[in-house]
UniProtKB/Swiss-Prot annotation:
It comes from the Archaea. Signal peptide: none annotated. This is Uncharacterized protein MJ1123. PANTHER family: METHYLTRANSFERASE. GO terms for molecular function: methyltransferase activity; S-adenosylmethionine-dependent methyltransferase activity. Coiled coil: none annotated. It comes from Methanocaldococcus jannaschii (strain ATCC 43067 / DSM 2661 / JAL-1 / JCM 10045 / NBRC 100440). To M.jannaschii MJ0638 and MJ1252 and M.tuberculosis Rv2003c. InterPro entries: Methyltransf_11, SAM-dependent_MTases_sf. Pfam families: Methyltransf_11 (PF08241).
Length: 205
């Protein structure tokens, strides 16, 4: 049993206990989300799919999937690097705090590109490794049941991967400018380099 199966309820509860952080991430991602048919890789408990009206998700955790399905999301148990979909099926794609757990992050983005329609958008949320928050998570990850096996990426690395794979119109927004327990309001800025959480979007041409 993987850690996300074992602690699915605890993971989901974290977002209730840290509501400002959750709302901050939603707000940063929302600026990139287009209309149309969306898919989320690593849909987890559906915390991000539901507010963005994403009806279908992929995850490897069956216990997480059960919670997501209670939120009205259809979950397919599969890996993000090997999606069970035809080419050019979706208008947009969300990968939120999942790349850091991928065996091959670039392959996951490449697979997302395959199932995206032309003109479709990929939206990626990360804890920026180069940020104060990323450095803090990196230092403490051995003590974390969730992030122990994470390989954090920087916003620069993700942007570089997107460019290498031929994506265009790359944009970023950032949030969480203080330690998590000190954040008292939702604040989002364009770009990256200050915030701990970065949302990056790009277009398939």
């Amino acid at each position: 049993m993987n850690v996300f199966d074992k602690y699915a309820e605890e993971y989901d509860k974290w977002f209730d206990e840290n509501e400002i952080i959750y709302k901050s991430e939603i707000e940063a991602l929302k600026r990139h989300i287009p209309k149309g048919r969306g898919l989320e890789i690593g849909v987890g408990t559906g915390r991000f799919a539901k507010p963005f009206n994403i009806k279908i998700g992929v995850d490897i955790s069956k216990e997480m999937a059960k919670i997501a399905e209670k939120r009205g999301i259809k979950v397919i148990i599969a890996k993000g690097e090997d999606l069970p979909f035809k080419d050019e099926e979706f208008d947009f794609f969300l990968i939120n705090t999942v790349l850091e757990f991928a065996e091959n992050p670039k392959k996951m983005i490449e697979e997302a590109k395959r199932v995206l329609k032309r003109g479709g958008k990929i939206i990626i949320g990360i804890i920026d490794r180069d940020s104060f928050l990323g450095k803090m998570y990196e230092e403490k990850k051995q003590k974390s049941k969730f992030y122990k096996d994470a390989n954090f990426l920087s916003a620069k690395e993700v942007i570089e991967m997107l460019k290498e794979l031929g994506f265009k119109n790359i944009k970023a927004t950032q949030t969480i400018f203080k330690e998590i327990d000190k954040v008292d309001k939702v604040e989002v800025k364009e770009g990256y380099g200050e915030g701990g959480f970065v949302a990056i979007s790009a277009e398939k041409i």
